[in-house]
Each structure stands twice: as structure tokens, then as C-alpha cells.
UniProtKB/Swiss-Prot annotation:
Family membership: Belongs to the FliL family.
Keyword Transmembrane: yes
GO cellular component, one term: bacterial-type flagellum basal body
Transmembrane spans: 18-38
Protein name: Flagellar protein FliL
InterPro entries documented for this protein: FliL
Physiological role: Controls the rotational direction of flagella during chemotaxis.
Subcellular location: Cell membrane
Mode of membrane association: Single-pass membrane protein
GO biological process, one term: bacterial-type flagellum-dependent swarming motility
Organism classification: Bacteria, Pseudomonadati, Aquificota, Aquificia, Aquificales
Keywords recorded for this protein, A-Z: Cell membrane, Chemotaxis, Flagellar rotation, Membrane, Transmembrane, Transmembrane helix
Disulfide bond sites: none
Amino acid sequence: MAEEVREEAQAGGGKKKLIFLLLLLILLAGAGAGAYFFLFAKKEEKKEEKAPKVAPPEVGIMYKLDPPFIVNLADPEATVYARISITLEVANQQVLQEVQKKEPVIRDAIIEIISSKTSNEIRTPEGREQLKLEVLKRINTILSEGGVRNVYFTEFVIQVE
């Protein structure tokens, strides 16, 4: 009977050692993982900081073509009007002066482009973007050296009668 008690005590001590070793192993694994993330996460953050910051593009001079354009569209089945306010972004003061000097020619070209479109062609975002590109290209062909960077529609209304 005394031998049985000793065997049970030794078996119980073995379980305690096993639990202690497992806890120690988990603790070491946690410490190792923490050290890894602490050391290597800092290096990744430093790499991101070293990446060159891209400066936002510089905005040019804005020029509003006033009054707004009120144009009949090319819809065959109904009378459709478009009211569009346009602002131009120009590269520099010289281009601005040329735009101001040639504004009647520019306005005529824009009216010609808009009046050739149907309401279905310019009703969608893609259609409006295409219209902007056409206007931009036409204006830059009118100017001696181009220089209009972008065309902005600040008002865009289509009305069907």
C-alpha cells in the first residue's frame, strides 16, 4: 500500500511538470512573437515613411465663361435645351489673356459641339466626360499653344419641352 501511494505521488508530479513545461513553452512563444512584431513592424513603418510623398497637382488659373451656355440639343423627337456653365483651367497668365481675347471664337466652338449632341449622349457621366474632352481639344486647337488644362461643368441642366 505504501508503494501505491508513492507511485500516485510520482505520477501526479509528472503531470504538474508537463503542465509547467507547456505553460513555459506558450509563454516563450508569446514573447518571441511579441519581439518579432515589435522589431519588424517598426522597420515596415520606416519604409513607408521613406517613400516620397507625391505632391498634389498644382491647380492652374480658373476662368469662367460667362454667361452660361443655353443650347438646343439635336434630339429629333422633342425640343430639348441644355444649360451648361463652364469654367476653364488654364496653365498661365498668357494663356488666360489669349482665352479672353478669343472668347467669342471659343464660345462659338462650344455651342457648335453641344448643339450637335442629343440628350441621351450627354445625360450619362461618361457622355459628359466625353463632351468635356471634345470641348478641351477644340479650345486647345483654337489657341496658339494650347494651354487649357481642364474643362469643368459648374452647372449642367437638361430640359425637355
